[in-house]
Swiss-Prot record:
The chain crosses the membrane at residues 9-29, 42-62, 63-83. It is found in: Host membrane; Host endoplasmic reticulum membrane; Host Golgi apparatus. GO terms for cellular component: host cell endoplasmic reticulum membrane; host cell Golgi apparatus; host cell plasma membrane; membrane. Homooligomer. Interacts with host BCAP31; this interaction seems to correlate with the ability of HPV-positive differentiated cells to remain competent for proliferation. Interacts with host ATP6V0C. Interacts (via N-terminus) with host HLA class I heavy chains A1, A2, A3 and B8; these interactions inhibit host immune response by sequestering MHC class I peptides to the host Golgi apparatus. Interacts with host TMC6, TMC8 and ZNT1; the interaction blocks their negative regulation. Belongs to the papillomaviridae E5 protein family. This is Probable protein E5.
Length: 83
């Protein structure tokens, strides 16, 4: 196994870990329960992007910027509204 294969596998593992964490967050927080279908659709699009057009690293960066950070901001805003 080369370094590239190891890095690719590690990146995929991080990607799937983030996916599982965010899916659990969506399921545990009631206002985000309705966003599960939207989130899964988005993750399928990111995976299709990874398979067809971009490298794993680029897709991971896209995932962080356009999925992970916005969901964190939505969660923070919801907590602010509750308190």
């Amino acid at each position: 196994m080369t370094n590239l294969d190891t890095a690719s596998t590690t990146l995929l593992a991080c990607f799937l870990l983030c996916f599982c964490v965010l899916l659990c967050v969506c399921l545990l927080i009631r206002p985000l329960l309705l966003s599960v279908s939207t989130y899964t659709s988005l993750i399928i699009l990111v995976l299709l992007l990874w398979i067809t057009a971009a490298s794993a690293f680029r897709c991971f960066i896209v995932y962080i910027i356009f999925v992970y950070i916005p969901l964190f901001l939505i969660h923070t805003h919801a907590r602010f509204l509750i308190t």
